[in-house]
From Swiss-Prot:
Binding site for GTP: 12-18, 40-42, 304, 330-332, 412-414
An annotated GO BP: 'de novo' AMP biosynthetic process
Native organism: Thermoanaerobacter pseudethanolicus (strain ATCC 33223 / 39E)
Name assigned to this protein: Adenylosuccinate synthetase
Documented EC number(s): 6.3.4.4
Record-stated family: Belongs to the adenylosuccinate synthetase family.
Gene (name only): purA
Amino acid sequence: MSTLVIVGTQWGDEGKGKITDYLAEKADVVVRYQGGNNAGHTVEKEGVQYKLHLIPSGILYSEKICIIGNGVVVDPASLIEEIENLQKQGISVDNLKISDRAHIVFPYHIKQDELEEISKGKNDLGTTKRGIGPCYMDKSERIGIRVCDLLKPKVFEEKLRRNVEKKNKLFKELYGAEGFDFEEMYQKYLEYAEKIKPFVTDTTVLLYDLIKSGKKVLFEGAQGTLLDLDLGTYPYVTASHPIAGGVTVGAGIGPTMIDEVMGVVKAYTTRVGKGPFPTELFDENGEFLREKGHEYGTTTGRARRCGWLDAVILKYSVRVSGITHFALTKLDTLTGLKKIKICTGYKFNGRIITDFPASLEDLAQCEPVYEEFDGWEEDIQGAKTFDDLPYNAQKYIRRIEELIGIKAAIISVGPERNQTIVLRDF
């Protein structure tokens, strides 16, 4: 590893947190490059669980530099709460760095998110209502407020006053809703500014210098390929770019500085919220995966929709992110199933297609074409090598490799760090 990007290959919730945590031990720097506190992951260390939303997983290692890049949108209240919770658990945050170019989430973003979802009725997108989308909207509209603005009281006052007036007018005229008090918000965010100020720096300079000096850098993505604003199942997507290409913009480095890309593949497929899901299961197998895999959102607590592994999706993810190898997670969840399936193509308009369609209307009409595999009953959570796995589990993994054209580098067989089979060193 010199620079390694970790991306989700499905609709998020692939287990990136555990893989990042595992690889972070060998990295010098861990960077978050997109999204906000709409994503979450749970990392275990020495039997203790840590729930993270904004701060990179590397924070659990005091010697690692952890960077929140310019592509992340930061809710200061959420960030400060996360910092304080880690400190209460005895975790140092001294090596946390926050980009001065990152955009700030405000209460009016959260309210706008909620009101827009309500106004869409049955056509709502199922957002986390954390204000992420509206914050990125303001960024695109060039009225966003950045961390560097927050640290200059007069500049911040001018920009916030303009935005509060604009948003209050929007809430009243479009939604018939109450607005916000400028002074109250201004004072509250000045308090936040003082608390985050020690962590703020130009992370583009810092990161460039770290890479040039030979440091090992791990880029930690949130969400997954199919939630990408351009390449995901639009409009049921997030407002940022959780693919490898998002790193260059969201962390402020050039594409030639990326050496490898690891795709995280859950051994089955899950999705939160609305939108087509070709391999979704509505039977006892779907319930089995949900309960055994504890498929409930870290951020929202929402039950995840569950289905069989979809190789069409995985091939698409490999292609658009240039993935070089993959980590397979939650293989142990499949233990106990008599039969396991992998979708190898879609039946659409009387023919078989193997490329992921752009149109959601087309995707909704796609019927999965499956290959069926025998399952296994053996407990695999103690497996230390590939050969320790049951033959049927090995066969399942090898078929995934054949279907998507890249090799597995890591296999996760349980939630603990030591329940990890490493096939390739980094």
